[in-house]
Amino acid sequence: MSSIPFDQKTISLLGMKMDTSDFYTFADRWLFSTNHKYIGTLYLLFSIGAGLAGLALSVIMRMELASCGDLILNSNYQLYNTIVTAHALIMIFFFVMPALIGGFGNWFVPLLMGAPDMAFPRLNNISLWLLPSSLILLLLSSYVEIGAGTGWTVYPPLSSITGHSGPSVDLAIFSLHLAGVSSMLGAINFICTIKNMRLKGLTGERLSLFVWAVLVTVILLLLSLPVLAGAITMLLTDRNFNTSFFDATGGGDPILYQHLFWFFGHPEVYILILPGFGIVSIIIQAYANKAIFGYLGMVYAMLSIGILGFMVWAHHMYTVGLDVDTRAYFTAATMIIAVPTGIKIFSWLATLFGSYLKLRTPLLFILGFLILFTLGGLSGVVLANSGLDIAFHDTYYVVAHFHYVLSMGAVFAAFAAFYHWFSIIKSFTTYEPHEWEFVYNPFELRKKIPYRRTDFSYLETAGILHFITTFIGVNLTFFPMHLLGLAGMPRRIPDYPDAYLHFNLISSYGSFVTLVSTIMFFMFGVVFNYNLFINGFPSMFYIIKPLIKITFFRIKQIIQGNNECLNSISKELTILILHVKRLSKLSVNNWSIA
């Protein structure tokens, strides 16, 4: 790419012409920013894009599983496994972690401590820009040769040179390395910020629970990621340099990889959910209008979860031949984790008890979180039993369990935080310096900004509709999976006997409902405010019509085996995009972040 001549007056960027001075201002403000608010906003935008890609992959899987036999993948089972791998890695490393830690963490950890910025602003910037590079490598791994169809665990010997001979797994490993470096740099930054940049007098007992949650999370990252890096580096040398760390024919052991991976993998689960715990605490505190019940107990519960998270990794490995004493220990240790988690759940309920609650969108998502996360935890207690897990291992019961914890735990917390902090994030450059003390003063529960405009609020009705449709969609998708797992349906298999048809069909319809609710979230809840909703109603009608047609009628045709309708879908998508572009012109004045 050639550099821009200094005498050139205009430049074309993404099809738009702008003055070079405007371009340099844009680049300096966004691409090279050291401001934690700009970087946090970019993290959120990146996670939204990655989340949509992950959602699209999951819908493709559910379309394939909507009926017995082959529907859309033409018996290409390797492609199905590649989609499974990409979906998992994208959702974990490029959606949940950038949104909860990079996005909301960067935005609000300094504000909740009274800090001017993060401790290392340039480190903050590079930890952001490593993520798009990592995502590109992961997407390339899916396109190179047969793709990386190993599952997100990348177990050898399937991931070895005999199982995947092409460079696809190598690219996926490099992608994980880059994402790990990004997370490590961010973790160092957060630890230094929280330790050294608090307001004078803001001791640990007065720190926000969200800051505590982020602190425990980044300590877990700092301790667990080097183990993953070592495991995948050994796998890389096994594949390319003739070592035999995980090759039994050369004296290695594939079970060693499983121990190393899950020593990272189980703390990773808590890394994903702990920032969500902090968000739940903040929103419940705001809507109950009182301090969280048992503050110190909540802090110690998070610390206990972090410590115990490193002591239970082998409950993912009950089927590999562990001796009975080892299985007894890991069963007991896993069940003990339910104690601090239960303390947090009951403390939140005790805070809500007796409060006058206005059921706004953020609180609805938090209540959904409490119900569904608890259900997911109960199925986790079942899986903790080493005897029962022999039957449930690698079935859809496990898929249902961790999606109840993540899809309805971490993601519900992210939606709640987005709605709760929406006006601040969208209008942060419009606040005067003296107004920030009203936005977040760590010593006050909440204050209203006097005479503040409400131009940047979301549509409450649209938010509630988004919650209801999402709640119905995710439960329709994942609850039948418990029953499929109990009946013995294995995961990561694109075909199944017709005895499993009805529950799979319900699950697929649930994923389509979730897809529609996500589209509604972008159309009505985020991008457009009330005035635009009224002025742009005719254009919205033209958007909704092809959307309904694609969602219900075309998908039904695909399920029935009519693949000729794919051309019609592409035409309808083209029409849809044209109308979205037309409508976006109406929203230009309402959708400027800076």
Swiss-Prot record:
Mg(2+) binds at H393, D394. GO terms for cellular component: mitochondrial inner membrane; respiratory chain complex IV. There is a cross-link at H266-Y270 (1'-histidyl-3'-tyrosine (His-Tyr)). One of its GO terms (biological process) is mitochondrial electron transport, cytochrome c to oxygen. It is a multi-pass membrane protein. Ca(2+) binds at E64, G69, P494. Fe(II)-heme a binds at H87, H403. It catalyses: 4 Fe(II)-[cytochrome c] + O2 + 8 H(+)(in) = 4 Fe(III)-[cytochrome c] + 2 H2O + 4 H(+)(out). It is found in: Mitochondrion inner membrane. Gene3D superfamilies: Cytochrome c oxidase-like, subunit I domain (1.20.210.10). This is Cytochrome c oxidase subunit 1. It comes from Physarum polycephalum (Slime mold). The gene is COX1.
